[in-house]
Amino acid sequence: MNAQRNQAQRSSQRNGTSVVTEMKSRQAAKIRELGQSLIDAGFVTLDQQSEALGLARSTTWTILRASHKGSGLSAAIIKRMLLSPQLPPLARRKILEYTADKLAGVYGGSRTQRRKFFERVRRATPEEAGLSRVNL
């Protein structure tokens, strides 16, 4: 109980701005960089962006509008984007930077949450193993 209270106190305020708010702001900024990298590579429309990311249009729209859930991009979404053959190199770099930052705790999360995220990111997907989801 004391540990939770201490953590809440540490993250409640710093220089008048919530630490959590700062972390979420950094996370949203990195996701906006991903969107800009797609535009810079010529993927301007939502259809083009969703194809480049290998995601559904609705998922792409939610992510790129930085209105994604508070915990950020899931390991499954990150892996799907990285597996997309149409993903431009700069967008790939932004996703890898986002992943490294998330693992380092830049966007928050306990050590346990970050460890679980790491395990999910590094676990091979059926596509990486040469299987299709249809064959499973």
Question: How should these model regions be labeled?
Answer:
Residues 1-4, 19, 131-136:
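Short intrinsically disordered terminal tails
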Residues 3-42:
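A short, Lys/Arg-rich alpha-helix, primarily the initiator
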Residues 45-46:
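Helix-turn-helix DNA-binding elements, focusing on the entry/boundary residues of the two helices
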Residues 49-50:
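Short alpha-helical "recognition helix" segments of helix-turn-helix
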Residues 53, 64, 82, 95-99, ...:
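A general structural motif at alpha-helix termini
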Residues 54-71:
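Recognition helix of helix-turn-helix/homeodomain-like DNA-binding domains
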Residues 72-93:
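DNA major-groove recognition helix of helix-turn-helix/homeodomain DNA-binding modules
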Residues 89-136:
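Short, charged recognition helix plus adjacent turn
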